[in-house]
């Protein structure tokens, strides 16, 4: 199984929408990322997953009006430190999880209702 697109958004970055899966903060975005990726890696049929997307969407919206805080970086190319910290942790142990040497992350992010357009 290859997961082609997933994301988590929060409202603490100044953008008005979370996208498909809302969480409380940038740290929670990182926790959700780690939980999701490690669960996919631990699945016996898991091949990989692809985070969408690299940059936040512009506050005025893209062609269809979406303006979500779903990027690894803001629109000024600055990383979200709290999210990146969790991604680094996940990346450092993902192969051990995939190989069954380590259990996947069980910590879950604090979810909020989705805000999407």
What are these regions (language model features)?
Residues 1, 42-48:
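Loop/turn elements at helix/coil->beta-strand transitions in domains of secreted/extracellular proteins
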Residues 52-117:
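Aromatic-rich peripheral "rim/lid" segments of glycoside hydrolase catalytic domains that contact
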Residues 7-8, 45, 62, 68:
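Generic hydrophobic/packing signal
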Residues 37-41:
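Non-transmembrane alpha-helical segments in soluble domains
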Residues 1-36, 52:
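Active-site clefts of carbohydrate-active enzymes
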């Amino acid at each position: 199984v290859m997961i082609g697109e997933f994301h988590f958004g929060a409202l603490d970055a100044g953008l008005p929408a979370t996208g498909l899966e809302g969480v409380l903060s940038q740290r929670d975005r990182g926790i959700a990322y780690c939980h999701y990726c490690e669960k996919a890696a631990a699945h016996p049929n898991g091949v990989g997953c692809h985070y969408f997307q690299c940059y936040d969407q512009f506050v005025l919206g893209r062609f269809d009006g979406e303006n979500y805080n779903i990027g690894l970086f803001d629109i000024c190319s600055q990383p979200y430190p709290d999210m990146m910290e969790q991604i680094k942790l996940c990346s450092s142990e993902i192969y051990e999880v995939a190989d069954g040497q380590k259990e996947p992350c069980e910590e879950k992010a604090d979810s909020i209702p989705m805000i999407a357009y």
